[in-house]
């Protein structure tokens, strides 16, 4: 039995129809009840196997069905993955996410996946993977290896889903989330704004997520990154206020979940990102690439954090390998210069 309020579509629709400033005020109040409003969880995402995916997700440049110019790459060597994780940690990330362009992993891949989970965990980082669909055995093996989070997005509402993906069903996505949860792994699941969906579809997506038996611990909200060669390359741009509104509704509906600004941040100016944080976003992906799409450079993120008075969650640093962590702390703590201003002091 669910241990949290069940939402109805009419209730969610009412939230989307609220005046924006009233909605933001409500979302910020709820956010402060459950989180430190000045703290942001920082994750890094690495593509451990890029391209040649057999699925037909219309937004994705990694699909083998579309000519996007993306070159397929084999699985990364274990040592290369661990080196990337170490650099991510020392740049300030507390969670290391690893993604593979698969419909699902094969049994032959499991020892490799278990090894990199164990290696990243040994560094003191939280681990997350996104590998497509899982069966019960695979979910349990990843749990036994120490995997903390598994990402499997619902993408959109059940009603609109068939317009975007035909190679796996909505129910298969829900089934994977259930298997992950039953294995004892935390769930990361969200969706994409800008696929051509209606506001009702956005409400339907959040309704599905919030009404899971246990809501996801992490909810990534992506803004569509339009890639030439994909069927959605000519979609209309997402209005910034519509995106901010979606963040706020997600925060209200899932008050204890981390709401993550995910793909599309490169397209957002600082003011839009600031309003997303006000709306209750408290997690970002950090670094120059998000799988195969651009992401703001690390220094740019640090500058924005300092302007807004935000602090990344801290992580332990390996002795003798802390240059980037020192730069992170120096950027956030040094007195104002011409490059920065303290928004909290205005």
From Swiss-Prot:
Catalytic activity: (4R,5S)-dethiobiotin + (sulfur carrier)-SH + 2 reduced [2Fe-2S]-[ferredoxin] + 2 S-adenosyl-L-methionine = (sulfur carrier)-H + biotin + 2 5'-deoxyadenosine + 2 L-methionine + 2 oxidized [2Fe-2S]-[ferredoxin]
Catalytic activity, EC: 2.8.1.6
Biological processes per GO annotation: biotin biosynthetic process
Bound cofactor: record note: Binds 1 [4Fe-4S] cluster. The cluster is coordinated with 3 cysteines and an exchangeable S-adenosyl-L-methionine. Binds 1 [2Fe-2S] cluster. The cluster is coordinated with 3 cysteines and 1 arginine.
Entries under PROSITE patterns matching the protein: RADICAL_SAM
Keywords per UniProt: 2Fe-2S, 4Fe-4S, Biotin biosynthesis, Iron, Iron-sulfur, Metal-binding, S-adenosyl-L-methionine, Transferase
Pfam families reported for this sequence: BATS (PF06968), Radical_SAM (PF04055)
Cysteine disulfide partners in this protein: none
Residue numbers binding [2Fe-2S] cluster: 97, 128, 188, 260
Keyword Translocase attributed: no
GO molecular function: 2 iron, 2 sulfur cluster binding; 4 iron, 4 sulfur cluster binding; biotin synthase activity; iron ion binding
InterPro entries noted in UniProt: Aldolase_TIM, BATS_dom, Biotin_synth/BioAB, Biotin_synthase, Elp3/MiaA/NifB-like_rSAM, rSAM
Domain Radical SAM core: 38-256
Gene3D superfamilies: Aldolase class I
Domain of life: Bacteria
Binding site for [4Fe-4S] cluster: 53, 57, 60
Pathway in which the depicted protein is active: Cofactor biosynthesis; biotin biosynthesis; biotin from 7,8-diaminononanoate: step 2/2
Uppermost EC category: transferase
Function: Catalyzes the conversion of dethiobiotin (DTB) to biotin by the insertion of a sulfur atom into dethiobiotin via a radical-based mechanism.
Stored PANTHER family: BIOTIN SYNTHASE, BIOTIN SYNTHASE, MITOCHONDRIAL
Name this protein carries in UniProt: Biotin synthase
Organism: Salmonella gallinarum (strain 287/91 / NCTC 13346)
Lineage start: Bacteria, Pseudomonadati, Pseudomonadota, Gammaproteobacteria, Enterobacterales
Gene name, Swiss-Prot/TrEMBL: bioB
């Amino acid at each position: 039995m669910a241990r949290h309020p069940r939402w109805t579509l009419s209730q969610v629709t009412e939230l989307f129809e609220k005046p924006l400033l009233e909605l933001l005020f409500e979302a910020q109040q709820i956010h402060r009840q459950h989180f430190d409003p000045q703290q942001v969880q920082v994750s890094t995402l690495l593509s451990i196997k890029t391209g040649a995916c057999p699925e037909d997700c219309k937004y994705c440049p990694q699909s083998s069905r579309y000519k996007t110019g993306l070159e397929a790459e084999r699985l990364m060597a274990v040592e290369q993955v661990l080196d990337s994780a170490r650099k991510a940690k020392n740049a300030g990330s507390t969670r290391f996410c690893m993604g593979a362009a698969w419909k699902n992993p094969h049994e032959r891949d499991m020892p490799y996946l278990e090894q990199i989970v164990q290696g990243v965990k040994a560094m003191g980082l939280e681990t997350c993977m996104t590998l497509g669909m899982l069966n019960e055995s695979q979910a349990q093996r990843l749990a036994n290896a120490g995997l903390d989070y598994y990402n499997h997005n619902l993408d959109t509402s059940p009603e609109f889903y068939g317009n975007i993906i035909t190679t796996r069903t909505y129910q298969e996505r829900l089934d994977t989330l259930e298997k992950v949860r039953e294995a004892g792994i935390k769930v990361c699941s969200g969706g994409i704004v800008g696929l051509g969906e209606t506001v009702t579809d956005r409400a339907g997506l959040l309704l599905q997520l919030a009404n899971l038996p246990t809501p996801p611990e992490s909810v990534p909200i992506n803004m569509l990154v339009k890639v030439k060669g994909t069927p959605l390359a000519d979609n209309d741009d997402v209005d910034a206020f519509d995106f901010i509104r979606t963040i706020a509704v997600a925060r209200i509906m899932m008050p204890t979940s981390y709401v993550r600004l995910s793909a599309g941040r490169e397209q957002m100016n600082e003011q839009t990102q600031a309003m997303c944080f006000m709306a209750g976003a408290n997690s970002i992906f950090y670094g120059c690439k998000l799988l195969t799409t651009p992401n703001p450079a690390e220094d740019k993120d640090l500058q924005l954090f300092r302007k807004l008075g935000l602090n990344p969650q801290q992580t332990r640093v390996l002795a003798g390998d802390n240059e980037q962590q020192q730069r992170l702390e120096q950027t956030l703590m040094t007195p104002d210069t011409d490059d920065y201003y303290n928004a909290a002091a205005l």
